[in-house]
Amino acid sequence: MKKYIIELIGTFFLVLIIGLTENPIAIGLGLAVLVYMGAHISGAHYNPVVTLAMYINDQIDLKESCKYIASQLTGSVVAVYTMIELGQDSFSVVSKTTEIQSFFVAEILFTFLLVFVILNVALNKSLKGNQFYGLAIGLTVTAGAFSVGDISGAVFNPAVSFGPSLLSFIDPQVVGSNISSSDFFVYFLITGIIGSVLASFLYKKVFK
């Protein structure tokens, strides 16, 4: 049970930080802190595509993966409602001028990078016991946010888009982008899965 609570709490604060600030440094450092907080309990996934990568690399079974993802999505929804209570009435992720093709390329590339970094710093035997894993993961998100934040919103995490997408069915203004509310979560899910699967199989077949 502790693992699922940590996944919910970690995802909650990650989504909350992203929703309340667009500063890539704050987001990256926030993620790093959350990773250090939960790594020894749940592995600190906070991201369905990270859980998918761990499943592909035999670190977690299917039943456990589903429970992790349910916890992450719940944390996302609670975070969005908390943002509203704090006065944040919109969640603008994708630029209204972004082309869908550019969005897909940006999200796939940097989701791949994020998952590949996580697999290497968390699973690689030569780096076992390292203390920089949290910073490596957080700084990867920071680099991605600076690089493609204006193109895709630099989400790299379907859980981050799940809460706003669900709420946007109630109020379409919650998500400020050129992507319709019905497609918002689906697009991030597709790009996340593609990036994660590519990184996972490359790591498993070549670098593990």
Segments from the language model and where they lie:
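Membrane-interface helix-loop junctions and terminal tails of multi-pass membrane proteins
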Residues: M1-K208
